[in-house]
A protein has these predicted regions:
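RNA-interacting cores
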Residues: 1-200
Length: 200
């Protein structure tokens, strides 16, 4: 018998800004909670990694950058106060614009840029396989490179992960549930993946 998982949606905000620091996930979450304190107590709420390009000035944001918050559909309206706000991310200013609701789609191949784990890749793959079995999901997986997020003494580490050959219902279940901890820092959140040969 598989567990009941709440239906999740993505709330997609337009954002404008030049760059964010390398350790932005920690500051970003603190700012979001400052503006919407209700988010802090919801372990299912996640913030998708921003699309950035590395440089000597930090992580550069594209002109059409988006901030995406994934959360249960029943909580989507809690993010409404974010529109029109300005975030201070380690000295970088981000202006949050309009929001729209985006339904999660059942792609057969999905990817998470970091699923929290120890540095033991074999144990990681075994744990992921066991977790998929717990969720009633049958699929193939490819473990990517080891990644980490640093913020002073705080370190979150793990591996990137591709899950493929998913049935539509299993794809939705996994995207709704995620894997591992620290969803608030962008970890364990799955998005569509087009080329399973690129695991960066």
């Amino acid at each position: 018998m598989t567990m009941t998982i709440p239906e999740m949606v993505d709330v997609v905000f337009d954002i404008s800004g030049d760059s964010v620091p390398v350790n932005y996930p920690f500051e970003l979450w603190r700012e979001l909670v400052r503006l919407v304190p209700e988010l802090e107590g919801e372990s299912s709420v996640g913030v998708l990694p921003l699309r950035t390009t590395g440089s000597d000035c930090g992580m550069l944001l594209p002109k059409r950058a988006k901030l995406v918050v994934r959360l249960p559909r029943s909580l989507a309206t809690q993010t409404t106060p974010l529109s029109g706000q300005e975030l201070n991310i380690g000295g970088s200013q981000l202006k949050i614009g309009k929001a729209k609701l985006r339904e999660i789609q059942p792609y057969s191949t999905i990817h998470a840029h970091l699923v929290v784990a120890t540095d033991d890749e074999v144990a990681f793959v075994e744990n992921v396989s066991a977790r998929l079995a717990d969720l009633g999901i049958t699929a193939s997986l490819i473990c990517g490179r080891q990644n980490s997020l640093l913020d002073g003494d705080q370190c979150v580490q793990g591996f990137s992960l591709v899950i493929h050959d998913l049935k539509p219902e299993d794809s939705l279940r996994l995207q709704y549930n995620g894997l591992g901890s620290d969803r608030k820092f962008g970890c364990g959140i799955f998005v569509p993946y087009k080329a399973i040969s690129d695991l960066n």
